[in-house]
Amino acid sequence: LNLTLDENVQAIVEEYLAEAMETFSVHGRGSAIVMNVKTGAILAMASLEQFDPNDPMTIYDDKMQTILDKTDALTADDIDWLEGRLGEKNVAGIIADGVISQETTEDENGNTISSEYTQLQGMLREAQWKNKNITELYMPGSVFKLITASAGLDSGIMNMNQTFYCNGELTVNQGSELWEHTYHCANGEVHNLQNMAQALDNSCNLWFIQAAQTLQPTVFYDYIQAFGFTQPTGVDLPSETRWTSVYNAEQMAEVDTNLYTAAF
């Protein structure tokens, strides 16, 4: 058995991931991967909080167990934590009245329905057993700007001297029947005229929206496919998620916001 994991890198990743989770009050578990950029080999992979495989039924997140054991009404903070860990849709019906009941009920056919406590307990156990790195969909955020930039350069449609103007906001579908939406840069920043390197340095959302407009949906989507974002990674670990939030070329052509959101 040959593993690509480096125990020293793994230990460092787990230490700093735990520190970051505490600093930023992470609700939905943290994940981190370190890869060899030349081969794709995984040097470290961590999902926190962890659990003890010898005692998998115990919920190791003290905050979650405290919420689960409450007999009075849940606070807004409690509900926020549950939704952050399990997803809003997953818990909405269970905690609709704000109280976790330990009583079983029956459906219209007389079948027993597990108590809300038991349902949530099972969901929390399953959540801590999962390897978050591969079983959950991850929204890449601003790191995707590198994909947009690469598509522009490789296609020859743009070069590093390509400039676009950032005035701080861009409103689409204004006054139309379609969904009106205003895009901003982080913290309301206005970056003015920038080339590609400056836009990457500033993580300018509006520059990359205009870059995607220049590329057009068909070319942009071709590169999204070429980078492998429309298919599983093929990692030799079980239960890799097959969900995707990538809009195809037709969807990006039909709805401007689909193209713009994908760009940055």
Annotate each language-model stretch with its function:
Residues 1, 31-34, 261-264:
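Non-catalytic, structured segments within soluble enzyme domains
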Residues 1-30, 38:
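Conserved, well-ordered alpha-helix/loop/beta-strand core segments that scaffold catalytic motifs
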Residues 5, 38-143, 147-264:
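Beta-lactam-recognizing serine transpeptidase/beta-lactamase-like catalytic domain environment
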Residues 24-34, 160-162, 212:
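Short, surface-exposed helix-loop/turn micro-motifs enriched in polar/charged residues
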